[in-house]
Amino acid sequence: MSHQEQQFQHYPHHQHHHHHHHHHIHQVQSETQLEQRSSDLEPNRSRNTDRIGSSMDFRNLCQRIDVDGLKAKLPQLKLPKSLPKLRGRKIFRSSKSGSNAAGGGTAGGSAKDGAGAAQQTHLQVAGQSQQFINRTPQRISTISSLMYEGEQEEIRANLGQSQPGTYRSAGSLDDDYYAPGSGDRASRPISPIKIPVVGALDDSSPSENGNVRTTFTQRLQRGYKSLSELRIKHIFAKQTTVRRDNIEVDRYVEQYERELKSEKLARERRDREIAENYDIKIKTLAGTRQNTFDDDDVEHEQFERGKISHETDESGMEATPPLPSRRKPGIAATRFAKVRKPPLEMEEEQQQAAAEESPQANPPPPPPPRPSSYKQLLINKLPHLPSLPNLPQFSRTKEETTKTAENADENNASRKLSIRQNIKRLRKSIKRPSKIKSKAAAPVPDSDEEEATPDGQKTKDAPTRSSTANLRARLSRFASTEQLQQRWRKSFKVAKEPEELETKAEGSATGGASGVLGGLLVGSQLEKTLAKLNEKVHQLKFFQRNANNQNATTSKQPKPNTVGHEPIEIDDDELEATYHRSDSLEAENGNGNENDDSGEDISAEEAFGQIQEEDNEEDHSQDQTKRGQSSVSGIATAHAARQMAKLAEIQAASKSGAAAWSSESLEEIADEDYPRVLIHQEHSDAYESTLIIAVASKGSSMSPVVRSSGLKSSPAAGPKTSPHPEIRISASGPQKSMSYSPGNPRGEPVTKRSPSPEFKTPAGGNKIVPKSETSAWLPNEQIIAGFKEQTSWPAPALYKPKSIDIFEASAGGSAAFADFDEALRNAPVLRISAGSSIDTSGEEADDSCSRVTRIRVQSPQIGNSRESLMAQEEEDKEAERDSEEEEEERDPSERPPSESPPPPPLPQRRPPTKRPATPPIYDAVPPPLPVSKPPPPPSVETIPSVASLPSPAPVTRSMAQRSASMSRPAKPLVKTSSLRLTYNEQVRPGDVGKVNKLISRFEGGRPRLCPRRMHSEEYERCAQPEDEEPEMEQILELQIIERRAVDSVTPTNRAVVIPQITVNNNNNNERQLEQSDQSDQSAHQEITDTRKTKSMELALDRQNSNCSRSEYGSPLSFPSSRRSSTPTNLNANSNSNPNPSTNPNQNPSQILQHQRRSRRSMTRDDDNFYSFDSDEENSYYSISPSGSSRYVVEI
């Protein structure tokens, strides 16, 4: 066993193989031990148990453990005696099991401890492994234990007995990993309390052999410690750490489980809310509503009104769908919207007819007969509204002169009056409701019903503001009722519809208000804009939902704007409860809406129009200015700012109810779950990135969304359903640009108009430069522009977004947003991104914009738009940082921003020992070395993992590197840019936070830096061969500095890692490392020979550090992945390293892939890896997560 153990000493470094070997060893040892055990199985168990008990207080452990079961498992558990690199889990679990079983035996079979000391030694080794629950860095001690295992098996057994908690537990990685141990651990998965060895000895002292064993075991321990200093170190450090960690682990697990439970509860709660909302949507159906509300006369009355509004009143219909949207962009709303929109298109034809009829104010009968009667009611009642004359005039005036600023001003004046009145009413009604409404927010369907009802009631009762009074009365009554939430939604939204619809219109919660008001306004404007709207609605179908609010907002905001906004009709369509009728209903709305304009909806419309003029002010800033409403919107902006604040409050109280189609109306989903972010997801084989751009904080997302609705029907569309439409928009970006293109020209000016390139940069930049993508992103950018213009929300900080690759699926979204929060807090970093215009693009103003855009532009070049975008942005940020820190290197054209500082490869671990180790490998390899070109293909093989693009161009290393790096960025981008992903995958859950902190600290929350390194690597590979001299000269300054930093940082790792690797020549990883290291060494030699080579080496260092960083894998395995490819390129470039570097590169390329796999598996599997390499790994990451020491250097 000692021989095997010695072999396994080497394997520990090569974990991948090592595991297999460990399993084998487990079998072998288990056979020998089983023989011994079979002879003295019971005595051994009892003695072993006694020893274990003596060494540790297993009675405590036994309390938790099924001693008998453990005893049964002990023979198996003890089989692997401190197999060096078995998982710490294995060892610890078996140790726990063994020690627990032993503890049980100690308790139950202490009398059995008579003889069998030798056998007990073996058993104790396993048992002690079981005893040792520590999962901390037992790997090293495990390696040493493997080295000494055969020799010190008895010693170890004794040691384990005397010091089960100290080394022995650390010694056998089995404990945690071994299956029986795992089974035992299943009962108490974290770890039984690790009692100090002394305590255990004292506790087990009752057992005679236990005491003797303890003394003997202690002697053995001391001997073993003397044998292995590593063990002693780890025993001491780990002994304490192990116990502490185990306890902490228990706490951690409990906490983790609690967190999981809480998360699960929250998730279930959200799901329930969604389900409730969805159910409410179902209830929203006329029949269901009737059934539901028949009991409640008021509710039923409201429902009837709502149903009427749904059936007859476009506004009612309009109002209700926004509520579903509010509820949450749930599947029904988002997906059915698509399903319904074709009917909407068909309805649009009806709408055209209706729009034609709309001037007549005769509702087209195609909708339920109620529309006509309802419209008639509206016609009858609307005249009664005090504001009716003004608003109908304005609405008609706007219908007639939609683009006249005069009418806008008039409307603004009347609207301001009505808005203020309505807001006053709204405040009165909302003050209570806001509280209730938060509750009511869940059953938004009621609010839908009420939304529809309010529309209907508005139009019907609007003539008599008494509807508001009635609603208030109802609210008061309902407030007293337990059904207050539902009734409140109904009554409050009825009351709020006139009032808050104004606010909603303001808050782009105008879904319902837009339905009524927008429908009214749209009715008049539909005639004028209906053809455009129909055309564009077809185009904007995707955005109809999104634009619906916007459309409502647009239609309400400026009737003038409505002309320009196709989405208005869409908004009506979308807002229509049926979504089918939206066009015909909207046409009805056109008919009835003109009348409705004169209805109390006028007050809502005025409030809304004013609010929306504010939105329009954004829109008008961009669009309204065209319409001459900018003067009005100027006033409306101040007023809207106030009302938006109030609306935000209202929405905060009831996110779902407050805004019909505001992203907040999306309720928590868009508002809370998403900070109002543009999520751009691109998934390619090589690379999946989610580019999340935080547009606004949650709170501001309401009003920003609203404003964005005001901004453009299309941009508003994005905001309204912002989360869903954003994605959808990006998906249908070309369509949106198509459909939005009428608005898009405005959008484009809006984007440009948005003074902050910061906004434009992330969202706008991407959006603006690529038109299709621009349309995809434009809504956000325009939204941001609107936000920035109207709201004082810190658009630069908030929106200066970190485009985050969310590779971490579970926490990715939330973590990414947390990063956004940090980034928003750290706006300077984002602004630095603006500085990064120095990067490839000199667009400092549109820095992030150009950067994002440039990235996106490059993405087609690279062929991985997401990858390119991510890498490019990261390049931009990194180049930005480089620009900051390396202004000297601010020659973006000469050197790609990512290239500007070639990522310092992890200091190439090229220990002389490794070089010797590799030469034997190279002995076979030398022939390939002459083939410098073939080695580059291996490097390409290495690169293939990164990007298996051009393996053939090794000789042209510039070409090969370039092509390789071009295709290569894909996976490296993922690896490098997905530090957190890799960390999440490979870091123990407890360490994720630390890793993220490290990453964030050095990344500045910019995972993209890694992809940028890939680009820099790419550029270096490409440019260094070509521009190597000039570019490398520049880069060398950084590289030298960075290399110093890297060397200063990583030399320890280098020394530590490489010597280990060199020592462990048996391991493939070692060989890979040796090969890659030797290739690095040879490359280093080449580099030494050539400054290009040296700069390349620096690049290698950076790349290596990037790679090791990106691949969470240990630094050891890193060289194979990235360094190997870089060395291969280096070898290709400077074949001065003849055979060794070339062939090593080939081998490394192959080994690299294998090593990546093994390292990935190791990192994911390995607690040992962390325990063992965690220090090195962390040091790397403290360097590399910083963007490889380059961050340290740059920053």
UniProtKB/Swiss-Prot annotation:
Region (Disordered), start-end ranges: 1-55, 85-132, 291-471, 493-515, 544-567, 613-637, 702-771, 833-977, 1060-1195
Top-level taxon in the UniProt lineage: Eukaryota
Keyword entries, A-Z: Cell projection, Cytoplasm
Cellular compartments annotated: Cytoplasm, Cell cortex; Cytoplasm, Cytosol; Cell projection, Rhabdomere
Chief subcellular location: cytoplasm
Tissue specificity of this protein: Restricted to photoreceptor cells (at protein level). Not detected until approximately 48hrs after puparium formation (APF) and then maintained in the photoreceptor cells post-eclosion (at protein level).
GO BP annotations, alphabetical order: cellular response to light stimulus; photoreceptor cell differentiation; photoreceptor cell maintenance; protein localization to rhabdomere
One GO cellular component term noted in the UniProt record for this chain: nucleus
Biased amino acid composition, Basic and acidic residues: 37-50, 300-313, 494-505, 1086-1095
Compositional bias annotation for Pro residues: 361-371, 898-910, 925-939
Bias type Low complexity, positions: 1-10, 109-118, 351-360, 940-968, 1114-1149, 1179-1195
Post-translational events: Phosphorylated by aPKC which lowers lipid affinity and promotes dissociation from the cell cortex. In the photoreceptor cells, aPKC-mediated phosphorylation leads to its displacement from the stalk apical cortex and thus restricts its localization to the rhabdomeric apical cortex where it functions. Dephosphorylation appears to be light-dependent.
Biased amino acid composition, Polar residues: 119-132, 545-560, 732-742, 856-867, 1075-1085, 1102-1111
Comment, domains: The phospho-regulated basic and hydrophobic (PRBH) motif is sufficient and important for interaction with phospholipids permitting cortical localization. Phosphorylation of the PRBH motif by aPKC inhibits the association of the protein with the cortical membrane.
Protein name: Protein PIP82
Source organism per UniProt: Drosophila melanogaster (Fruit fly)
